[in-house]
Amino acid sequence: MPDPDLARPRVVCLCGSTRFLDAFDAASILQTLAGNIVLSIATTRTADVDLFADRSPAEQEELREHLAALHRAKIDLADEVLVLNVGGYIGAATRGEIAYAERTGTPV
């Protein structure tokens, strides 16, 4: 049970592949029940590759860059980063997020 006297709950940013949406859901509820504020990806329950399939390659790249910048901003707000490495998988984008967190001093 969260401590009601806690001045501010810890802020946890979830990082991982959008292939594993169920892992994001599970981690989000577990962290919330542990009393943490959770920053995560926005999801429509569709993987990015499918969600943006109707956009041109240039639009897809621009959108990926925009979403990556937003996620780095979430990392900046977080007290820690929780990496969801389902089956040991950590993709290039997640490796970049981990490196960013480490460079900026956010514990991973």
Question: Residue spans of the language-model regions?
Answer:
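Conserved catalytic or regulatory cores that recognize and/or transform ribose-phosphate-containing ligands
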Residues: M1-V108
